[in-house]
């Protein structure tokens, strides 16, 4: 079965002041009116699984207006394991941790696999092979912690 999100907590993240969501072991559906924070919730989950936001914001844009810092954290459970992942945003930067130990964004993928599909992703079909390769590379980064280093080495080799 692997790990699954048990709970998600957002504090001063985007438009959300303080929210704790308990996820169902089967399926969780986010329902609400416009501007209720559904997309912000999906963005927070993606940050904790991929190590970055699909919106590509600056760290300051992640912090709720009027707040000094933001926190996104999740408890992942499954296979007899519990893993806590967290991202604190403050002073213009993001700090990730797993089970209370600081780590870097590239270390986050692989803890819990996720795939995000937005209406903008329809361009995968339209934009050609390079766009599809970029998307596959994103999946590779989540599946294997060393994949980012491998891609960087490949890019350097191709340049020379």
Language-model features: where?
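Pre-Walker A-like glycine/lysine-rich segment at the N-terminus of P-loop NTPase domains
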Residues: 1-47
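Weak global preference for isoleucine
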Residues: 16, 21, 82-85, 108, ...
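Nucleotide-state sensing region of NTPase/ATPase domains
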Residues: 46-147
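Generic structural signal for well-ordered, non-membrane alpha-helices
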Residues: 134, 156-159
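Amphipathic alpha-helical coiled-coil segments
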Residues: 143-150, 154-157
